[in-house]
Amino acid sequence: MASITGHCVAHFTDLSTRKSSFFSNSNNNSSLFRRKSTNIVTRKKYIFCSTSLSMNGCNGDPRAPVGTIETRTLPAVSTPALAMERLSSAVANLKSTLPSAQSGIIRLEVPIEEHIEALDWLHSQDQKNLLPRCYFSGRSQVTFSDFTSNDLTNRNGSAANGHLQRISTSSDDKNLVSVAGVGSAVLFRSPNPFSFDDWLSIKRFLSKNCPLIRAYGAIRFDARPHIAPEWKAFGSFYFVVPQVEFDELHGSSMIAATVAWDNALSLTYQQAIVALQTTMEQVSSTVSKLRQDVSHTSLVSKANIPDRTSWDLTLNRVLEEIGNKYSPLTKVVLARRSQVITTSDIDPLAWLSSFKADGKDAYQFCLQPHEAPAFIGNTPEQLFGRDQLTVFSEALAATRARGESDSLDLQMAHDLFSSPKDNHEFAIVRENIRQKLDAICTSVETEPMKSVRKLKRIQHLYARFAGRLRSEDDEFKILSSLHPTPAVCGFPMEDARKFIAENEMFDRGLYAGPVGFFGGAQSDFSVGIRSALIGKDAGALIYAGLGVVEGSDPALEWQELELKASQFMKLMKLEAPALK
């Protein structure tokens, strides 16, 4: 058990009356979820409300310490049912013992001798009522790339190929494969842009001594004053420390229950315990294997925004800007949103299960607030990872399909590796990331040679970086500096971002934003590409994008969008001709 003096938190009791309705219409600026929402203003901050008793950690003093941060590990058991019994007893004991601290966070965890997949556990829970929920799986079951100057010189692989090993300070943390969580011990959400104070508000609840207390979530691609209705529940950012968490480890598992409170924000210790017990009563201890041969869903229609004609016009507009000697633009990343209507509701976790079977060289994630759609993804790209003061990042750009044979695959990789247009696009991304790391880190190692990163269906140009931060506060600088990278926005960033805001006909929301977790000693964030927003009433929004540079061809780039969206489209049977 570890107990430290941390920072103070802000809480809020959420009482929402929202109802969500998916796909109200499909015009360019359509809001795909219409719902009534209750909003109140507290301490000059706009606060979201939800039906569960929880606290919004963004509403207190980010620099005031939380009274206690603890992890208590109970004896191991053989099954999830026994683990929940042990947790329930431990939580009841907590209720009978009032802490001296006015605020705090306590994690109770029970190891399980059996190996159970976190996604199976999450799918076995009540998917309609046990919200919010989250899921995060590291790339190739590895979250942090550990390499040195010698490694960079001698290796030409990627983390996905198993050359890099994970480093950590906790045996359980070291063995962690994936995490699933339900309920909210503390959440962090606001319509305002993610700030240093928001980062501090999250970090106050975290400790190096409690590495598995983590805040999982995501940040929008771009903060804007008017968030589209389908993204409203996520705010400008959304992070949650789950009340009940299932950790999948190598060869074993673990169930944890977390309680967080702050008297100053009107959520007392006793209230937090009752809220946790209410959530635990809904948790199922029976875990069924999630079938990976999804889906019985058939595709009725598909509508792209922009459509092919508008795409060609916008891409040619980018090329004109790039060719203008008075314009600073050298690259703009354009995106497409595909609205699909299906014969039945899509199971977001079944889609994730299919991605896990399809290939392990990517991060898989799911984030779903209360009364909101599920944001899921299968992204190959890391924004950054942090272990203590060491930070990792990577450049990933340019795309080719995989070949049907080894010889064709090698030929396509060679074409990618030698293409002037693709190398120019990749060079923009790599140099920009290197410069941003140089500006923040005391030292930076750059992989001297680019390589080809091979995924299940596509391949990219790829290079890695490692740097040393001056202080832990530099984590926020890394996040705010690296995002958005030229791989999802363009270059120069502000010029590309302005072009996107003025020309893109939909709200990207969390698409292409940072998705991952903050921890006390470690953090890991992917880039939320290859993602979709899945709601109720039979439908989804599928997002894909690509970089436009000098030499880009509208027809070829459209084909690349189709290739990137294919991981989702292949999961649906064709019921009727898709709309173009």
Curated annotation (Swiss-Prot):
GO BP of this protein: defense response; phylloquinone biosynthetic process
Q: Which Gene3D superfamilies match?
A: Anthranilate synthase (3.60.120.10)
Query: Keyword annotations for this protein?
Result: Chloroplast, Isomerase, Magnesium, Plant defense, Plastid, Transit peptide
The Gene Ontology terms for molecular function here are: isochorismate synthase activity
Name of this chain's protein: Isochorismate synthase, chloroplastic
Classification via NCBIfam families: isochor_syn (TIGR00543)
- Say yes or no: keyword DNA repair present: no
- Give the miscellaneous note: Two isoforms can be purified from cell cultures, but they are probably encoded by a single gene and may arise by post-transcriptional modifications.
Q: Give the classification, highest ranks.
A: Eukaryota, Viridiplantae, Streptophyta, Embryophyta, Tracheophyta
Record EC number:
5.4.4.2
- What is the annotated localization of this protein? Plastid, Chloroplast
Q: What does this protein do?
A: Involved in the synthesis of o-succinylbenzoic acid, 2,3-dihydroxybenzoic acid and salicylic acid (SA).
**Assigned protein family:** Belongs to the isochorismate synthase family.
How does its activity hinge on pH? Optimum pH is 7.0-9.0.
Spell out the Pfam families in the cross-references.
Chorismate_bind
Q: Name one GO cellular component term.
A: chloroplast
Q: What induces it?
A: Up-regulated by fungal elicitor.
State the InterPro entries in the record: ADC_synthase (IPR005801), Chorismate_C (IPR015890), IsoChor_synthase (IPR004561), MenF-like (IPR044250)
Predominant location: plastid
Q: What cofactor requirement does the entry state?
A: Mg(2+)
The transit peptide region is found at: 1-91
Q: Which reaction does it catalyse?
A: chorismate = isochorismate
User: What are the disulphide bonds in this sequence?
Assistant: none
Q: Per the entry, what modulates this protein's activity?
A: Not inhibited by Tyr, Phe or Trp.
